[in-house]
Amino acid sequence: MSGSYPFIDIAALDSVREGFARGDAQLVLAHDLSTVLWVNGPGAKLFGYNRVEDLIEGQLDLPVATRRQIAAFSSENTSAPSAVAVRLGGGLRSELTHLHVSNIKLPDGVAALLVATQMPDNSAEAAISGLGDDSTHIALVDAVGKVVAASPRFALLDISASTLEDLIVEAGDATDRIVKRRIRTGSHSVPGAIARLTDTPALHLLCIVGDAPAQFQTAAEAVPLPDNAEAVLEEILPEQGDAPAQQAQKTHAEQPRPKTFAFDHDAPPARFIWKVGPDGTFSEISPNLAAVVGPNSADIVGRRFSDVANVFGFDTDGSIAALLLERDTWSGKRLLWPVEGTRLRVPVELAALPVYSRDREFLGFRGFGIVRPAEAEADPEEIGLALAGGIPQNRKPRKEPAETARMVGEDDVLALSEEVANDDQPAAVLPKPPLDITPTPGRRDSDKVISLLNSCAQEKVAADQAKFLKEKERATRPEGGLTKTERNAFREIAERLRKQGLANTRAESETPVSETSSIEPVEPTPPVKTRSEPIQPDETALLANLPVPVIIHSGDAIHYVNQALLDITGYESLDDIRSAGGVDVLFNSESDDGETRQSMLLRHADGSEEPVDAHLNAIAWRGGRALMLSLMPVTAADLPAPAELPAANDEEKQALEAHVEELKTILDTATDGVVLIDPEGRIRSMNHSASALFGYERDEAEGKFFSMLFAIESQRAAMDYLHGLSGNGVLSVLNDGREVIGREAKGGFIPLFMTIGKLPHTRGFCAVLRDITQWKRTEEELTNARKEAERASNQKTEFLARISHEIRTPLNAIIGFSELMADEKFGPIGNDRYRDYLRDINRSGNHVLALVNDLLDISKIEAGALDMQFEAVSLNDAIGEAIALMQPQANRERVIIRSSFQSNLPDIVADSRSIKQVALNLLSNAVRFTAPGGQVIVSTSYELNGDVVMRVRDTGIGMSKSEVEQALKPFRQINALERRKAESAKDWRNEGTGLGLPLTKAMVEANRAQFAIDSNPGQGTVVEIVFPPTRVLAD
């Protein structure tokens, strides 16, 4: 097991060992989220690898969305695992996997990320799966030295039970839970290590590094080679004379790349990626273009498109330059690109997509192009020679058969693109598919733009792959299909053809091409049949005897058909098919009614048609390349059963047609957009509202993929929603809709709320799209209003705090000097009126200071910035202290204060200072608003439901409901001029600041209690404060 860290060192970490013992899938990544530092067997299997060695110290190409989710959770500076749900896989087979991401420290202190998830198989064998080879042996050992699970060759080491027991004792005594030393195996010792994974029950991981005994190695290595091994080796490796194979491989590996560029006229079409900035400057271009037109001709990074067009002489009408200024999606633009070192120029087709940032800032264009070297034409200006710095030497590149070049890139009637061809086709012969799902280290994000521009093609590939998997899983076929023996024979033949094609391609690429300054004419020799001939007569005979119809063709040229195809189509021979029109006459991809079928239609000689399933493979054929198309007739059991409709007479038919027209009219009248989708995800039809919403005509949108209606960032969510409904899963029951971003025909974006439902008979879907632009605008306005209110509150709090500081200093001076003068410490004042003035000054200063304090407190409470020290508070003691402070004022006002405290009242969780302030405010108001001779009663109680209640009741003048509401608002005082008591009672409600009750209510709610007031004019007021059971410290 390779890696920068020993496998057992990371397996013994506290955050890893228990999950390893359970059989969880675990992966340790560097913070670049690409480099794999460590992985166990289930973790390697989760990401598609069978062996741990295949992934450790490698590059893991996670999807962009998965990287973004993991990076968001890994940015938190905590070691606690965070749960994240990601999709692993691709297309319709992607599965939602719940991962746990946590930050860990490696043995050398380096920070890393641990990604783990539970696996269904938690056996001991699964925990050590993917580990162990001829020189590395792994085992799980329990507390008594019993081997619970082990790698296949572990038993050959012959480790005694006493040795295992000693290792277990040593691992239990080690502070780091790991012991590394030489371990006795049979008659010799080898390096090894043991780590204690769990304690209850005890489980240990044992790693041995060393070869098995020689007698076992001999038996294991003496495995006979296959009969065709020599032939396979001769096909794969080029002949090197008498030199050893190792020296030949070394020479080939060290062979330098050619310094000069040679144009290959017969090369297949090649795709390349390009990107320009907002000013039209090329910022990126893939090397595929340089491989066709030369490195100097493709060296355009850092140059503006207009400058390149002027130098190379294309886009003379300025159409592409104008499209770059419009910032809209475009495609199908053709230009002629000069080829370095030649007098030729090749056609290039370009397409581009505008790129915007999250803030809708235009970042430029990302696009792809297709260069077609087989269609090269003469360049009258000979720009390619200038790019090479002169006329190059006459070199003739090795040519492939013309049929192969013509085969690639053609839009034949089979409608099968390179994306659905065999995945094993050589890249040097057939063009790379637009969506490469093979993990590639260091892959740039711009390489994925093709999948965005070709979303339709991508979904077609996914649909074809799903159909192919369904065909593979079918155990038996009805009459007319393949038996199990026939299917196995057919697959074996296809595999042999494919492997021979790969061997020929590899041999041709590894054969060195020697350059000669002059070529001497030689006598022509007859062609000699070499051993690399792809198809032998016996294999052709096997194809001829298969019951499966087979066609070998290149583009429109048919090379071979077997007897099964002639029987099913009714033709007498291959010449009859060629004379009738070739491939065009055999297939029809659309039915007469224009509906696109999931299967193809094979046309017979008499004009009748039959649905078939087609599978395409790239093979080697008579020294060149060709495509092998195998056909499987679709029986009635495979076709979807049409919905049975009862027979209807003319009147019922007319009624049904009228009803359908009414429903169409209703749909067109609805303000929401309605789109009908077929099972393949294509648009069947849409109503007038949807057509107006997206700016597409009905005929223009029909037949195109549903994903075209959405912005790039919403296409995945929309298609996942659609696929989730097709699977009869949770989404089909809990259908709550999705918020997506729609894309207009002119490139604009619309926020939409989409709801999709299933159609029962056609297996299609119905999508209802509602424009929520106004909702989003209202939501944004409310958010802005909330932010503005919070900002105003913060400004008010800051202003009050600042003004309070400025007012306190002079107020303290006024109050202090007035008290000093009233005491006459430096001499008599001499006049009683001056003494009264000083007392008024002191009283007024204290009043202003109390007002400032109340303003600051209520602003802090509203802003949530009041410092609260929650602790156990005795409510009886707090109220008693407040009564003691208010008793002198009550005596002056001739008001009686009575108390009724419940004994054994439990403490409450509250802020002691604010509780005392609440009691003082309530008692002060009760005394002030009670006439002489009245009473104020303060009581506490412990209710049966666990509440602690404090009540303050007075016999004062009381208030009406409207006056209570006004009194609870800041800076509002009750106008008592209209209602005064006729007798000697004095109405004190005109005094004060109007902050008493609002401040009291705010303090009560800040202590998580409930404030209630009940008052009636002339009957007094009752204030009740209830502390819920969650704030009561009951025994």
From Swiss-Prot:
Region span, Important for polar localization: 1-613
Domain PAS per the UniProt entry, residue ranges: 659-730
Description of how the protein assembles with itself and partners: Interacts with DivK.
One GO BP: regulation of DNA-templated transcription
Protein name: Cell-division control histidine kinase PdhS
GO MF: ATP binding; histidine phosphotransfer kinase activity; phosphorelay sensor kinase activity
Histidine kinase domain boundaries: 802-1031
Modification Phosphohistidine, positions: 805
Organism: Brucella abortus (strain 2308)
Region spans: Disordered: 500-533
Cell cycle found in the keyword field: yes
The encoding gene: pdhS
SMART domains hit by this protein: HATPase_c, HisKA, PAS
SS bonds (residue pairs): none
Compartment list: Cytoplasm
PANTHER family: OSMOSENSING HISTIDINE PROTEIN KINASE SLN1, TWO-COMPONENT HISTIDINE PROTEIN KINASE
GO cellular component, one term: cytoplasm
Role played: Functions as a polar differentiation marker. Essential protein that, by localizing in the old pole of dividing cells, controls cell division and maturation, probably through control of DivK phosphorylation status and cellular distribution, which in turn regulates CtrA, a transcriptional regulator of the minB operon. The asymmetrical localization of this protein is probably required for cells to enter a new division cycle.
SUPFAM superfamilies, alphabetized: ATPase domain of HSP90 chaperone/DNA topoisomerase II/histidine kinase, Homodimeric domain of signal transducing histidine kinase, PYP-like sensor domain (PAS domain)
